[in-house]
A protein has these predicted regions:
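Conserved beta-strand-loop-alpha-helix junction that forms the acyl-donor binding cleft
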Residues: 77-79, 106-117, 133-139
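Conserved acetyl-CoA-binding loop-helix of GNAT-fold acetyltransferases
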Residues: 77, 81-96, 118-122
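Short amphipathic alpha-helix that is part of the acyltransferase structural core
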Residues: 1-26
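Conserved GNAT acetyl-CoA-binding A-motif
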Residues: 95-111
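Conserved acetyl-CoA-binding loop of GNAT-fold acetyltransferases
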Residues: 120-130
Length: 158
């Protein structure tokens, strides 16, 4: 697994353009910016764009991503050969190894994107909340995975 390099940006952008229906807002500038910040991984035709939060952020109706939590913003692959799961699990290991990251990974996905939701569930992500975009017009689901130790104590109801 490796971080994307600036020379990868055109290839990555073309991959997103092929999936414009799912990723309508991805621009070349966004990709280039994330590459410069080392928030973009590109390996075996799989792109993962992520961020380690520097402050608490509301990401679901009832869910907040805490400082040092990871948010997986986008994952896209050019093949349906298992490389997506393989690279995603290597990404989980990478986040788990970072001393400055909590080990909690969140992502949100459109509620009607059944293919992506099955993919995340196959990779042991848990549906934890709902969200919406576009002033409530687009419904979404929030998933979470914990890759460091037993963090359940932080998520038990009061």
């Amino acid at each position: 697994m490796r971080f994307a390099r600036e020379e990868d940006s055109t290839e990555i952008y073309e991959l997103y353009k092929k999936n414009r229906k799912i990723f309508p807002n991805i621009t070349m500038g966004h990709i280039t910016n994330r590459i410069k910040k080392r928030e973009c991984i590109y390996t075996e035709g799989v792109v993962i764009i992520f961020r380690i939060h520097q402050k608490t952020v509301q990401i679901g109706d009832n869910t907040k991503s805490q400082k040092s939590d990871c948010v997986l913003n986008q994952i896209v692959t050019s093949f349906s050969n298992g490389s997506g799961s393989r690279i995603l699990n290597r990404f989980f290991d990478y986040i788990g190894s970072l001393p400055h990251a909590s080990g909690v990974i969140h992502l949100s996905v459109r509620s009607d994107n059944d293919r992506a939701k099955k993919f995340f569930e196959r990779n042991e992500m848990e549906l934890v909340d709902k969200t919406s975009w576009g002033k409530g017009k687009i419904e979404g689901d929030v998933y979470r995975k914990m890759v460091k130790g037993d963090l359940d104590m932080f998520f038990t109801p009061p």
